[in-house]
Every structure is written in structure tokens, then in C-alpha cells.
């Protein structure tokens, strides 16, 4: 048997992982400005953590979860999304306690798992970056979080992004709308897809965002959630819209957008961009004020979003956006002869300990091959170290771009290379 990676997974090799590191680092910097702190949860959870919060009737739970019984006969699932594990952690660790500052803001990054048909930008092991904010029902929290996502997408370089906005109202408004939707769809049941016929019985709102052609036709004249909002829900949604407008964030009201998870209420949103004629959601989220209490904590407001890293990178690639990744070596040491081997090791270590990105040859190759390696690594400077240089204690350092050279002592390189580096036209941080 040929050993290969499982279907729906990928190896992220160095050329690609540099892009991942850039995106993750960029997100950390943005989140830090908004006072978010990182939380890391297990990649597997008890089955009930996901099934009860995400919803027993959702596609995630009924079709896509990786779940199994461990050796202790515990029902375990690999996490398919990030919010439920963070809420579980928030409650379990009593982060709702009075001494914890509110709102409490967390972000997470890591792998998620769903058993679905692999395709471009959608894998069975995929990676999410997300944020969760607990303790504020203020609509300004909705808007701050949405605008943070908009800022991140703009600054990372995603083009043509449109914000789709909707509300699911409070539980009372949602219940009234649910009944109206059942009344509307029941006479049309036989025209719906098999999945949507099931959804009509279990969670009729999910029919609204079905991708099946017959379902899209059926919901064209469906009632709008906006007609069933009570005063509280309407006031919250109006405030969100007004604040977005005050911040200059454009949006589209999309009453057929309901999101694929059952825990949302009030504001929900998606950032969508068009790629090759297809609408791709790059970031999505919303408010979930009942989820903390559902996990056994006190009544606590919540708001958050998640974005898929694979899809983000796919969109950047399709849009021709080159991330500003710096992979160049500061120094490459070409080594000539066995007598220079030990000194080359000492020198490259000294350079690294001064903060320089440095590499040397270990393979006793001809100089031409070593110089080619320096070019492949885009080395800014080149040092050729042979037995004669070791004996004299003097070496030539060359700017590998301009070919300018300086003669310096090995001791100077070992103790203060930054002075030489700057003399050759480069700057140290």
C-alpha cells in the first residue's frame, strides 16, 4: 500500500506555509488592536458540545461530523467549528466571573474537521480564524466586530467584498417568523428538494439558504423576517444599520441569509466576493445571546465570526494578490575545504545569535553550486570562507545584489555584523 495523506487533507509545504504565517500574524496584529486575546481549545470535544449547540438537525451534525467512541466509550467528535468549543471553555473556566473584565474578547486559530466533498477552498481538515466577544448586548459590539472583519479583509488585500446583513430577531420574533414560513412552505412541500422537505419539518429557516434550484424558486416570494420583528428586535437592527452607515461600511440587506448554525439570533452577516462567476463567502458570523446559558452559564450576550484560511488564500490567489512575504537570507556562507568547516559553524551561529537569518553550506560542494544556493535563498550578503581566510582571520563580505565588497575580520563578524551589514547598504531592525 502506498502511504498517502487522507482524502480531503493537504500538506502545507514551506512555500505555502509562509503565506499562512503571514495571514495568521496579520490577524493577530489586527485583533490585538481591538483588545482580543488568544484562546486555544482541544481539537476534539464531547459530541454533545457540538450537537446540542450547533443543532441536531443541521447538516454539520447530521452529515459532516467526524465522531467516534473512544476506548472509555465516550462519544467524541473532532471540532467542526470554533464557537461552541470557545463557549464551552468560557463557561467551564468561569470566565463570566465578576473579576473578569467585560466584554471578554477572544480569538482562536486552528484546524476544524468536516466530512464533506473536497473541492477548491473546502477540505475535510480546514483551518479557521475566529473571534468571540462575550458580555455585551450593545449593538455597537455587533458593528465593531463586523467593521474589524471588514478592515482585516481590506488590509489583507481581498477585493470586491460585499457585506450581506440580516437579523433573526430575538426568540419571540424568530418563533413568529418560523410559523409564517411553515405556513408558506407547507403547500409547496412537494416542489422542494428532499433535503428541504426534511428541513421544513426540523428547521424551516434552513430552506431559505438552500443552494438547490427548486428551493430557490420556492422561496422567491417567502415572507421576510423583517416583517416579524418585535420592537426590541427592530430597535437593535436599526441601531446596527445606523452605526454601520456612520462608519462608512456599506451593506446589503439579505433576508434569505440565515447561516448554517442554530445558535444565532439578532444580527447575522457574511462577507461575500465573486470569483469566476461564483459567490464565495470569505467571513461570516453573528450574535448568539443564548449560547452561554445553554452551556450552563449565566445569561450572557455573545457575538463573533469565523473565516476559512484556505478559502481566504484561494481568493487572494485568484485575485492576483501577492502577500508581502520576506524569505530572503541575510547572510550565506560559502565554505571551501574541510579546514573551514568548524569556523563556518562558529560564524553562522554567531550571526544567528545577533539576530541575522543565516545559512552555510554543509555538503562540500564546488563554489559555483554554493553561489547558486545563495541566489536561490535570495541572500543579501555572501561570505566565502576557506582555509586561507581561517588562517588570516580576514574575510570578504559581498553585497550579493550590487557586488560591492568589504574586507573585515572574522572577529568583527562574530561580534558586530550589523555595522558591516549597514555599510553594504542594508538596514537592521
Curated annotation (Swiss-Prot):
Gene3D superfamilies reported for this sequence: Anticodon-binding domain (3.40.50.800), Bira Bifunctional Protein, Domain 2 (3.30.930.10)
CDD domains reported for this sequence: HisRS-like_core, HisRS_anticodon
Catalyzed reactions per annotation: tRNA(His) + L-histidine + ATP = L-histidyl-tRNA(His) + AMP + diphosphate + H(+)
Record carries keyword Ligase: yes
Keywords, ordered alphabetically: Aminoacyl-tRNA synthetase, ATP-binding, Cytoplasm, Ligase, Nucleotide-binding, Protein biosynthesis
An MF annotation (GO) of this entry: histidine-tRNA ligase activity
Pfam families on file: HGTP_anticodon, tRNA-synt_His
Enzyme class: ligase
A GO CC term assigned to this protein in UniProt: cytoplasm
Listed EC numbers: 6.1.1.21
Localization in the cell: Cytoplasm
Any single GO BP term: histidyl-tRNA aminoacylation
First-listed, main subcellular location of the protein, grouped into a coarse class: cytoplasm
Presence of keyword Cytoplasm: yes
Subunit structure: Homodimer.
NCBIfam families given in the database record: hisS (TIGR00442)
Family: Belongs to the class-II aminoacyl-tRNA synthetase family.
Name used for this protein in its record: Histidine--tRNA ligase
Source species of the chain: Streptococcus pneumoniae (strain JJA)
Amino acid at each position: 500500500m502506498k502511504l498517502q495523506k487522507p482524502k480531503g487533507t493537504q500538506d502545507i509545504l514551506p512555500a505555502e506555509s509562509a503565506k499562512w504565517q503571514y495571514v495568521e500574524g496579520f490577524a493577530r496584529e489586527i485583533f490585538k488592536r481591538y483588545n482580543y486575546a488568544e484562546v486555544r481549545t482541544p481539537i476534539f470535544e464531547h459530541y454533545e458540545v457540538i450537537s446540542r449547540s450547533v443543532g441536531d438537525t443541521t447538516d454539520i451534525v447530521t452529515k459532516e461530523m467526524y465522531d467516534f467512541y473512544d476506548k472509555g466509550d465516550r462519544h467524541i467528535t473532532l471540532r467542526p467549528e470554533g464557537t461552541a468549543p470557545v463557549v464551552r471553555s468560557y463557561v467551564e473556566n468561569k470566565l463570566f466571573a465578576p473579576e473578569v473584565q467585560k466584554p471578554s474578547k477572544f480569538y482562536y486559530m486552528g484546524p476544524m474537521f468536516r466530512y464533506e466533498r473536497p473541492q477548491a477552498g473546502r477540505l475535510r481538515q480546514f483551518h479557521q480564524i475566529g473571534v468571540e466577544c462575550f458580555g455585551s448586548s450593545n449593538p455597537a459590539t455587533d458593528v465593531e466586530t463586523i467593521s474589524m472583519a471588514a478592515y482585516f479583509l481590506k488590509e489583507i488585500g481581498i477585493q470586491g467584498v460585499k457585506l450581506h446583513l440580516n437579523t433573526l430577531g430575538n426568540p419571540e420574533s424568530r418563533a413568529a417568523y418560523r410559523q409564517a414560513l411553515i405556513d408558506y412552505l407547507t403547500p409547496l412541500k412537494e416542489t422542494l428538494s428532499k433535503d428541504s422537505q426534511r428541513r421544513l419539518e426540523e428547521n424551516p429557516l434552513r430552506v431559505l439558504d438552500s443552494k438547490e434550484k427548486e428551493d430557490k424558486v420556492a422561496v422567491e416570494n417567502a415572507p421576510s423576517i423583517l416583517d416579524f420583528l418585535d420592537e426590541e428586535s427592530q430597535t437593535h437592527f436599526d441601531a446596527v444599520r445606523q452605526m454601520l452607515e456612520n462608519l462608512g461600511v456599506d451593506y446589503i440587506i439579505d433576508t434569505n441569509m440565515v447561516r448554517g448554525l442554530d445558535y444565532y439570533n439578532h444580527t447575522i452577516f457574511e462577507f461575500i466576493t465573486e470569483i469566476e462567476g461564483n459567490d464565495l463567502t470569505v467571513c461570516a458570523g453573528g450574535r448568539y445571546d443564548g449560547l452561554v446559558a445553554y452551556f450552563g452559564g449565566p445569561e450572557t450576550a455573545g457575538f463573533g465570526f469565523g473565516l476559512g484560511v484556505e478559502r481566504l488564500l484561494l481568493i487572494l490567489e485568484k485575485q492576483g494578490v501577492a502577500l508581502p512575504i520576506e524569505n530572503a537570507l541575510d547572510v550565506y556562507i560559502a565554505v571551501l575545504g574541510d579546514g573551514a568547516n568548524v569556523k563556518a559553524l562558529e560564524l553562522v551561529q554567531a550571526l544567528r545569535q545577533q539576530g541575522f537569518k543565516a545559512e552555510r553550506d554543509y555538503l562540500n560542494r564546488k563554489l559555483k553550486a554554493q553561489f547558486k544556493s545563495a541566489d536561490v535563498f535570495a541572500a543579501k550578503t555572501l561570505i566565502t570562507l576557506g582555509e586561507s581566510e581561517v588562517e588570516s582571520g580576514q574575510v570578504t563580505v559581498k553585497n550579493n545584489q550590487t557586488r560591492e565588497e568589504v574586507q573585515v575580520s572574522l572577529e568583527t563578524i562574530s561580534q558586530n555584523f550589523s555595522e558591516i551589514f549597514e555599510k553594504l547598504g542594508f538596514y537592521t531592525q
